[in-house]
Amino acid sequence: ATSLVAEFRSFDLIVAVTGEWNVDVLLCDLQSRKTGIPPIIFGWVEPNATAGHAVLLDSSDDTACLRCGFSDSGRFSRPVTKWPEGAEMFQEPECGAVFSPYGPVDQAWSQALISELSINTLVGRATAKDYHIWVGRKDRVEQLGGDWNEEWISIHGNPELGGRVIKTSWMSSASCGARHETEAA
């Protein structure tokens, strides 16, 4: 692990899009401990790829903490969309496998969002805690059985028909715990 951290220091940027919460927490913790790793862009999609997120966190900002926006188990606290239980995943007939019905076209919006933030970071046009949100089309969300999340609307406003990018700053939470424990250590 020590050699991996040393190798990270030679990078200009880390883009974390694995969807593995434990990996994201490790990267967040390494950065908060001022280990010299570069800025990190975390990216993820919501169910059915109907919304996407990209956040830039940099150790130059002591309040930059990915965990502030997630539960301890990695559930995002402010999704754009909401879904009835079970509507996010479908089961294949005659098989135990489950899947979310989206593909490359649906993901393209989120990939572009993450790519744009990555390029802006590398050329110096982004700052720590930049947070970009792709809000998919309302008709697609409704077609798949979802809706806009009222809590998200109360913070960011009604996206109406969707199909837009929102640029804001990443949240900080005094109740985050994990971030504040590493600062006290």
Predicted segments, located by residue:
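S-adenosyl-L-methionine
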Residues: A1-S3
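Glycine-rich phosphate/adenylate-binding loop
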Residues: A6-L13, T18-A185
